[in-house]
Every structure is written in structure tokens, then in C-alpha cells.
């Protein structure tokens, strides 16, 4: 039985692939669960259009992520003044992803979602310059130098 997949199926293929499967597997599992449709010329044309639209969207997303990367890199180092600093230079608490996003926005950078900020494994708990990664796209990452200073 020839089918066109409408969803990613493990060990079989991804969306838009035309696959040959046993009749029982197609009739009893793939078709009832909406994971595939019967292959025909019209269905193949529709699958090709969906694949082209998905590729175009992926390319636009990658270009948009590259534009944001250039804007963030243009900022250089981003300063983050912290109010709660001990005399020894240690912070009472630590820097959060929300703090990083606010510092980038305040420095004139783009508005980012705090979930894409990747802080180092060890928490930032001291004054100084720290590298912070921002995951914009599966293929685009940018490193921001975060300069944590004591607010006066």
C-alpha cells in the first residue's frame, strides 16, 4: 500500500514522504490515527506544496534569526547593574534569564524570550564579565558578554 505521511513516524519517514507499507499497518494504524493518507496524484501535489511551504518558512526563520544575531552582536558587551552586591563582589542571589533579556532590551537590542537564553551551568553569582549564550534558531546561536556591575 502506498501512503503519503502527514506526520513524522519513527522508523518510517517524515512529513510528505511517500512510503510503501503492508496493507494491515496502513489500514489499521497509519490511516485511522491520521498519520498518513492514501497516495494519489492530488495528494502528492498537496504534499509537495506543504513541503515547499515548510522549507520557505524554515528559510525565513533562519534569516530572521541571523538578523537578530547581527543586532545582538552590534551591542558588544551588555551591562547589567545589580543592586544586591556584597563588598566582596558576590551577589545576593544570582542572575536570571529574565535579567539578561531586560539588559539586552535596555541596551537597545531586540526583545527576546527568556526561554532562549542559556545561562552557564554554574550560576552567575559574582560581579564581572560572563559569556551567556542565546539560542535563536536550531542553526543560529550568539554569545553575549554580560558585564555584571554593582549599582550605585
UniProtKB/Swiss-Prot annotation:
It comes from the Bacteria. GO terms for molecular function: rRNA binding; structural constituent of ribosome. InterPro entries: Ribosomal_bL9, Ribosomal_bL9/RNase_H1_N, Ribosomal_bL9_bac/chp, Ribosomal_bL9_C, Ribosomal_bL9_C_sf, Ribosomal_bL9_N, Ribosomal_bL9_N_sf. Signal peptide: none annotated. Keywords: Ribonucleoprotein, Ribosomal protein, RNA-binding, rRNA-binding. Pfam families: Ribosomal_L9_C, Ribosomal_L9_N. The keyword Ribosomal protein applies. Gene3D superfamilies: Ribosomal protein L9, C-terminal domain, Ribosomal protein L9, N-terminal domain. GO terms for biological process: translation. Disulfide bonds: none annotated. Coiled coil: none annotated. One of its GO terms (cellular component) is ribonucleoprotein complex. Belongs to the bacterial ribosomal protein bL9 family. HAMAP family: Ribosomal_bL9 (MF_00503). Binds to the 23S rRNA. This is Large ribosomal subunit protein bL9. It comes from Mycobacterium leprae (strain TN).
